[in-house]
């Protein structure tokens, strides 16, 4: 099961609240081939699409992701934690 930690949800909400996003725009978890940036995943701003899954925090949608990628990341945890490179989101697959 894909899990988003409380720490990650708090940081996603902080990021979302700090942006002036247009109505209907959200933070999206993207993985290859959609994600072409550094690393194995990224968080981008995008509109909600049919079949998306929403992650809520304090009754606010803080993250969306394609329903079909949940099988690819079904045993993973999205977290926000301190790493040797500083505080960042991590996607740990088990």
Per-region residue spans from a language model:
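Short, low-complexity, intrinsically disordered N-terminal segments
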Residues: 14-27, 56-57
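Short, structured protein-protein interaction patches enriched in aromatics and acidic/basic residues
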Residues: 22-48
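Long, hydrophobic N-terminal alpha-helical segment
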Residues: 1-19
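Detector for the mature cores of small, proteolytically processed
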Residues: 39-94
């Amino acid at each position: 099961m894909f899990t988003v930690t409380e720490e990650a949800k708090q940081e996603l909400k902080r990021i979302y609240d700090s942006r002036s996003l247009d109505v209907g725009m959200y933070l999206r978890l993207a993985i290859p081939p959609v994600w072409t940036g550094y690393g194995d995943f990224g968080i981008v701003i995008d509109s909600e699409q049919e079949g998306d899954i929403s992650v809520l925090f304090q009754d606010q949608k803080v993250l969306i992701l394609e329903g079909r990628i949940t099988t690819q990341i079904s045993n993973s945890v999205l977290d926000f934690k301190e790493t040797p490179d500083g505080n960042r989101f991590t996607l740990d697959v088990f």
